[in-house]
Amino acid sequence: MESIEQRVKKIVAEQLGVNEAEIKNESSFLDDLGADSLDMVELVMALEDEFETEIPDEEAEKITTVQQAVDYINSHGKQ
């Protein structure tokens, strides 16, 4: 079974149209991976679906890197 980190990276790659190999834990969605605000909304929705959790807007705004997404899912999502 894939780790949460692997699953998050796969979703990021699909949502942002980037190569999964280019995605690092410290990658910023906006600065490094070229996401815009609409991409971020879609990314959060995809993470919510994958991990069966709800990410409130105020929390979603704090998630700016791959590692922050992984950390959030680890503490709030269903494995």
UniProtKB/Swiss-Prot annotation:
Pathway: Lipid metabolism; fatty acid biosynthesis
Every Carrier domain range: 2-77
UniProt keyword list: Cytoplasm, Fatty acid biosynthesis, Fatty acid metabolism, Lipid biosynthesis, Lipid metabolism, Phosphopantetheine, Phosphoprotein
InterPro entries registered for this protein in UniProt: ACP, ACP-like_sf, PP-bd_ACP, Ppantetheine_attach_site
Gene3D superfamilies: ACP-like (1.10.1200.10)
Residues found modified as O-(pantetheine 4'-phosphoryl)serine: S37
GO cellular component assignments: cytosol; membrane
Origin: domain of life: Bacteria
Role description: Carrier of the growing fatty acid chain in fatty acid biosynthesis.
Protein name: Acyl carrier protein
Origin species: Bordetella petrii (strain ATCC BAA-461 / DSM 12804 / CCUG 43448)
Upper lineage: Bacteria, Pseudomonadati, Pseudomonadota, Betaproteobacteria, Burkholderiales
Gene, per the UniProt record: acpP
